[in-house]
C-alpha cells in the first residue's frame, strides 16, 4: 500500500527513466530542421563524419543525438516514415543495452534502425536477431534502404547459405538473421581449422526482436550439432510394444512436473515382458547391465503418457515433427534428445531415425551472454522482468504508446465443461459475424484449433484458404453487401504455408480466423485487410501501367471502406437485466478486431500477445477469454475448489461465471507456473554454466592454435608433460631403481608410441634417478620427432602437427560432451545421499576435464610419434584443411580429413597380426578386441590413438 502511494507521488522507476530521455528527444527534434535541409550527399557524408569523430576520441553516447536525427531523416527520404518521439526513446533504451517493451503496431522494426546505425559506426558489426527467416529477410530488405542511403552495408543470414555467403553477410555493418542461425554459425566456426574459414567476426552488439520468445521460452532448448550413432531402431520398436500392455495402475503420472514413473507392479510386469523377449540381462531390471534398458523403458513411457499427437508434435511425411509450445509452429529439424524422439517415432509407427552423438552444443542463454552489449524488443516483457535481470542483467523499460490503446479487455467467462465453453464461443462468433466484426479465436494447440473448426463446420460455416483469390473474393463480396459470408480460416502448423495470407486478411469485415499461438507474433493484422497483399495478388497479371494504377486506387478505396465497416462494428450488450418498469441497462462494446481466447496459457505473456493483435496504433478492439474447468491450466493447477464453489452457487448448464476475482485467481495460478518455470531455467543454467566454462576454454584454445603458424612449442610441451605423467605413474618419486615398475613403463611406452626404449637397461645402471630417466626419455622422443622433421620437411610436419592437434582436440571434446551428458542424467541421485548435486557435478565435471586434457596430451604425442605422411602422386601445395559442414537439421558430418594419416590402413587377417607389432595389424574395427591381447576393445586400447 505504501509502495502504491509512493509510486503515485513520485512516479515509478519506469516513469522516471522515460522522463530522463525527454531532454534528448527534445534535442533531436531541435536538430530536425537543419538535418532536413541537407542534400542527400551531405546527409550521407555524416556517416564518415561520425566515424572520424569516434576515431578522434568521442564516444557513441556523444554521437547519439546527431546520429538519431540523421537516421530519422534518412527514414523519411527512403521509406516515407518518420520516427515518433516514443520510437526515439525506444532506440535509446536499445542503445543502452536494455529491453524496450513496445505494444503491437508501435514500429519496433523501425526503432531498431536507430541503435543499429549508431553502434555500427564502431565498425565491429551489429547483429539483429529475429525469430524466423521470413522476418530476417523482410527486415533486412526493408530497413536496409535506410542503411544503404547512409552508406552502410546490410547482410542477412538465413538457412541454406554456404560459408562464403555467410562470411559476406557477417562482414556487413548490420546483419539480420535468426537466433538459430547465429547460434549454429558460432558452433560451426568452432569446428573449423582455419581462421579465414570462420564466418562470425565477434560478438559486439545484438538486438533481439521478440526477446521474450528467444531468451525465455527457448532458453531451455540447446542448439546441438550432432552426428549419427549406431542404428537401434528395432530395439526401440520392441520396447514400444511393451507400453500398451501396461495398466494405468502400473505407473504414476505427474502432469505438473511432466514426469512418469513405474510402480512396483509396473516394474514386475516390465521385467516379465523383457525376460520373455530376451531383452533382460541378469535377474533384475535394475541390475547394472540393464541401465540402458531402463532408460529406454522410461523414455517410451514418457512418449506414451506425457506427449500428445497434434499438441506436442505432429506426424508428417513419415516424420515426428515437434510443435513449439509457445509459438505453435513446426520446429523442422529439431529433435528431442536422449532417445525420446526415437521413442515417439516408435509410438507413431514411423521410421525410427538413428540416435545422434553431440558434436557441439550451446544454449541461447549462454550464446547471447557472450555479446559485449545485448538489447531486446518485444510487446510482452514486463511479466518476466525479474528473470531478464537475474539471468541477462537486462532491465525492461515500458515505452509509452504513440496513441492511447483503445482496446477493451473484458473479464473471462468460466464454464463447467468444454462443451459448454465451445457453445458459448460459437454463439459469440455468430454475434460478431452478423455485424461483420472480424474475429480471431486463439487456441493452445493444433488439436484444439481443429475441435473449434469442427464446431463451426457443424454450424454451417465453411473453411476456406485465404491464399485462394476466389475464396477471398467471396469474403470481399459479402462485406461489400453488408452480409456475413460464414467463412473461416485455420492457422496452425499444418497450414503454415498460408500464414502470410491468413494474417493479412484476418482484419477483413466478417473474417473468422482460428489460430494457434502462431498468430501471436510477427505481421500486424490491419483493419480492412492488407493493402500490400491485395496489390500483390490482384495486379500481378496486369501489364498496362494505367490499368494497374486504376486497380490500385480501387483496392485502396475498397480497404478504406472495409476499415470503416470494421470500426463501426460495435456491439451493444446487456449489463443489467430489466426490473419491473426499469429497462435493461446496456453498454457499447467497441468494433475493431475481436480477440477470443479459448483457454488460458501457462504464461501470461502468451495471453497478452494474443490480446495484443487487436488495438494497434490506437485502433479500437476487444478481447475476451472463454474458459472451462476442464482446460489444462484449470485442471492441472487445482480447479477442484472452484468447481465446488460453482456448484454451491447453483450454476446451471450453459451458464458462466464472470467476475474479476476469477481473473485474479487465474493470474495467481499463472504466476505460480511462471515462477516454477523460472526456477527450472535458473537451475538448468547453473548446470549448463559448468559445461559453458569448459566450452569457452576449449574454443579459446582452438582459436589460439589456429592463429599460430606453428604449434611445435605446444606439442613439445604436451609431449614432455605426457612423459612426466608416465614416469610418475610407474616410478615413485625418489625411489630406488629396484622399486620402479620397469616392465609396466616399457610396455606402456611400446603401446603408446611404438618404440622399444631400453628403460630396463637404464634401470640397471648404478645411481640412476627418476630425473635422469625423464631427461633420457625426453631426448629419445625429441630425437624421434626431429628425424620425422628431417624426413618430411618442417612445413609438412608443422601442418601435420596442427592438423592432428585440432582433430584430436575435437574428437576428445565430443567424447567429453557425452560423458558430461551421462553425468548430468545421474547426478541428481546424489541428493539422496545429502550431497548437493550441483557441487557434485562441478567437481566430477572438473575431474573429467582434467582426464580429457591428459588423454589429449597422450593421444597427440602417440599420433605424432607414429605418423607417416602419404605423399601425393604429383608434387603440389598442401591443400587447406576441409572443415566440418554440419547440417543442424540432419546432424550429418561431412568432415574430410587432411592429407595426413596413420599407416598402414589395409585390412590384415587376424592370424597374421603380431600382438607386439601394431604396424602389422592393418585396419582394425573399433569394436573388435584389440590385437595386443589386452582383452579390451580396440577403441578403448590402441584404437584411442588411431
UniProtKB/Swiss-Prot annotation:
Annotated binding of Zn(2+), by residue: 930, 932, 941-942
Subcellular location: Cell inner membrane; Cytoplasm
Cross-referenced Pfam families: P-loop_SecA, SEC-C, SecA_DEAD, SecA_PP_bind, SecA_SW
Biased segments, Basic residues type: 936-946
Family annotation (CDD domains): DEXDc_SecA, SF2_C_secA
UniProt cofactor(s): Zn(2+)
GO BP field: intracellular protein transmembrane transport; protein import; protein targeting; protein transport by the Sec complex
Co-factor: note: May bind 1 zinc ion per subunit.
Region of interest: Disordered: 872-892, 904-946
Main location: membrane
One term of GO molecular function: protein-exporting ATPase activity
Subunit-structure text: Monomer and homodimer. Part of the essential Sec protein translocation apparatus which comprises SecA, SecYEG and auxiliary proteins SecDF-YajC and YidC.
Full protein name: Protein translocase subunit SecA
Amino acid at each position: 500500500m505504501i509502495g502504491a502511494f509512493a509510486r503515485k507521488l513520485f512516479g515509478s522507476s519506469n516513469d522516471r527513466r522515460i522522463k530522463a530521455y525527454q531532454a534528448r528527444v527534445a534535442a533531436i527534434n531541435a536538430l530536425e530542421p537543419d538535418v532536413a535541409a541537407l542534400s542527400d550527399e551531405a546527409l550521407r557524408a555524416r556517416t564518415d563524419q561520425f566515424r572520424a569523430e569516434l576515431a578522434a576520441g568521442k564516444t557513441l553516447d556523444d554521437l547519439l543525438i546527431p546520429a538519431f536525427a540523421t537516421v530519422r531523416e534518412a527514414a523519411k527520404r527512403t521509406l516515407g516514415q518518420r520516427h515518433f518521439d516514443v520510437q526515439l526513446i525506444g532506440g535509446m533504451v536499445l542503445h543502452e543495452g536494455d529491453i524496450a517493451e513496445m505494444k503491437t503496431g508501435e514500429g519496433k522494426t523501425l526503432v531498431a534502425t536507430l541503435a543499429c546505425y549508431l553502434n555500427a559506426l564502431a565498425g565491429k558489426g551489429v547483429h539483429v536477431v529475429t525469430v524466423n527467416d521470413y522476418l530476417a529477410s523482410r527486415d533486412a530488405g526493408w530497413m536496409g534502404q535506410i542503411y544503404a542511403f547512409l552508406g552502410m552495408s546490410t547482410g542477412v543470414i538465413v538457412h541454406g547459405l554456404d560459408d562464403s555467403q555467410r562470411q559476406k553477410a557477417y562482414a556487413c555493418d548490420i546483419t539480420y538473421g535468426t537466433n538459430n542461425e547465429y547460434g549454429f554459425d558460432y558452433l560451426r566456426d568452432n569446428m573449423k581449422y582455419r581462421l579465414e574459414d570462420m564466418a562470425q567476426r565477434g560478438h559486439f552488439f545484438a538486438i533481439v526482436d521478440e526477446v521474450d520468445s528467444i531468451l525465455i521460452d527457448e532458453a531451455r532448448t540447446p542448439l546441438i550439432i550432432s552426428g549419427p550413432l549406431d542404428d537401434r531402431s528395432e530395439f526401440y520398436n520392441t520396447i514400444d510394444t511393451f507400453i500398451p500392455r501396461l495398466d494405468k495402475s502400473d505407473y504414476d503420472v505427474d502432469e505438473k512436473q511432466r514426469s512418469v514413473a513405474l510402480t512396483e507392479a509396473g516394474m514386475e510386469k516390465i521385467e516379465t515382458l523383457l525376460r520373455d523377449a530376451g531383452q533382460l540381462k541378469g535377474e533384475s531390471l535394475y541390475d547394472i547391465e540393464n541401465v540402458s534398458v531402463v532408460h529406454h523403458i522410461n523414455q517410451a513411457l514418457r512418449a506414451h503418457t506425457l506427449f500428445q499427437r497434434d499438441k506436442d508434435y505432429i506426424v508428417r511425411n513419415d516424420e515426428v515433427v515437434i510443435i513449439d509450445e509457445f509459438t505453435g509452429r513446426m520446429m523442422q529439424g529439431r529433435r528431442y534428445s536422449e532417445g525420446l524422439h526415437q521413442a515417439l517415432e516408435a509410438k507413431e509407427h514411423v521410421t525410427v531415425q538413428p540416435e545422434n552423438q553431440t558434436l557441439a552444443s550451446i544454449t541461447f542463454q549462454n550464446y547471447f551472454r557472450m555479446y559485449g552489449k545485448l538489447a531486446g524488443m518485444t510487446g510482452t516483457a514486463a511479466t518476466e522482468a525479474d528473470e531478464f535481470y537475474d539471468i541477462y542483467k537486462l532491465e525492461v523499460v515500458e515505452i509509452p504508446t504513440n496513441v492511447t490503446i483503445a482496446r477493451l479487455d473484458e473479464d473471462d467467462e468460466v464454464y463447467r465443461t468444454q462443451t459448454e465453453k465451445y457453445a458459448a464461443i460459437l454463439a459469440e462468433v455468430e454475434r460478431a459475424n452478423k455485424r461483420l466484426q472480424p474475429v480471431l479465436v486463439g487456441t493452445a494447440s493444433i488439436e484444439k484449433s481443429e475441435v473449434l473448426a469442427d464446431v463451426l463446420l457443424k454450424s454451417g460455416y465453411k473453411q476456406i484458404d485465404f491464399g485462394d483469390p476466389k475464396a477471398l473474393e467471396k469474403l470481399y463480396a459479402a462485406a461489400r453487401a453488408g452480409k456475413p459470408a460464414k467463412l473461416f480460416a485455420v492457422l496452425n502448423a499444418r497450414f503454415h504455408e498460408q500464414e502470410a495470407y491468413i494474417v493479412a486478411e484476418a482484419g477483413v469485415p466478417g473474417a473468422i480466423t482460428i489460430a494457434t499461438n502462431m498468430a501471436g507474433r510477427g505481421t500486424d493484422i490491419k483493419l480492412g485487410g492488407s493493402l500490400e497483399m491485395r496489390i500483390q495478388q490482384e495486379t500481378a497479371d496486369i501489364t498496362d501501367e494505367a490499368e494497374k494504377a486504376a486497380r490500385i486506387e480501387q483496392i485502396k478505396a475498397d480497404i478504406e471502406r472495409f476499415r470503416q465497416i470494421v470500426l463501426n462494428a460495435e456491439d451493444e450488450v446487456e449489463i443489467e437485466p430489466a426490473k419491473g418498469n426499469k429497462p435493461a441497462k446496456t453498454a457499447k462494446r467497441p468494433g475493431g478486431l475481436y480477440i477470443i481466447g479459448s483457454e488460458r496459457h501457462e504464461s501470461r505473456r502468451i495471453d497478452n500477445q494474443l490480446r495484443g493483435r487487436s488495438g494497434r496504433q490506437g485502433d479500437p478492439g476487444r478481447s475476451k477469454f472463454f474458459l472451462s474447468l476442464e482446460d489444462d491450466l484449470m485442471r492441472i493447477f487445482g480447479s477442484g475448489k472452484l468447481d465446488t464453489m460453482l456448484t454451491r452457487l447453483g450454476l446451471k448448464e450453459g451458464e458462466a461465471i464472470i467476475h474479476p476475482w476469477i481473473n485474479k485467481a487465474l493470474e495467481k495460478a499463472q504466476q505460480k507456473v511462471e515462477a516454477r518455470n523460472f526456477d527450472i531455467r535458473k537451475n538448468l543454467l547453473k548446470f549448463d554454466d559448468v559445461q559453458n566454462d569448459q566450452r569457452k576454454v576449449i574454443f579459446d584454445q582452438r582459436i589460439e592454435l589456429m592463429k599460430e603458424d606453428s604449434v611445435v612449442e605446444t606439442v613439445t610441451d604436451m609431449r614432455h608433460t605426457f612423459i612426466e605423467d608416465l614416469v610418475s605413474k610407474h616410478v615413485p618419486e625418489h625411489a630406488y631403481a629396484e622399486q620402479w615398475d620397469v616392465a609396466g613403463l616399457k610396455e606402456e611406452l611400446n603401446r603408446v608410441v611404438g618404440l622399444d626404449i631400453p628403460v630396463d637397461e637404464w634401470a640397471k645402471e648404478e645411481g640412476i634417478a627418476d630425473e635422469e630417466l625423464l631427461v633420457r626419455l625426453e631426448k629419445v622422443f625429441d630425437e624421434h620427432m626431429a628425424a620425422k622433421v628431417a624426413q618430411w620437411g618442417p612445413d609438412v610436419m608443422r601442418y601435420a602437427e596442427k592438423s592432428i592437434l585440432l582433430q584430436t582436440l575435437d574428437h576428445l571434446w565430443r567424447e567429453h560432451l557425452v560423458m558430461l551428458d551421462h553425468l548430468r542424467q545421474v547426478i541428481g541421485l546424489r541428493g539422496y545421499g545429502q550431497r548437493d548435486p550441483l557441487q557434485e557435478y562441478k567437481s566430477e565435471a572438473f575431474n573429467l576435464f582434467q582426464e580429457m586434457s591428459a588423454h589429449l596430451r597422450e593421444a597427440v604425442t602417440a599420433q605424432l610419434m607414429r605418423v607417416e605422411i602419404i605423399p601425393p602422386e604429383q608434387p603440389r601445395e598442401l591443400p587447406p584443411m576441409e572443415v566440418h559442414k554440419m547440417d543442424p537439421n540432419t546432424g550429418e558430418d561431412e568432415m574430410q580429413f587432411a592429407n595426413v594419416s596413420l599407416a598402414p590402413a589395409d585390412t590384415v587377417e587376424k592370424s597374421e597380426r603380431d600382438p607386439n607389432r601394431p604396424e602389422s595389424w592393418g585396419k582394425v574395427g573399433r569394436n573388435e578386441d584389440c590385437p595386443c591381447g589386452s582383452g579390451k576393445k580396440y577403441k578403448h586400447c590402441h584404437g584411442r590413438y588411431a
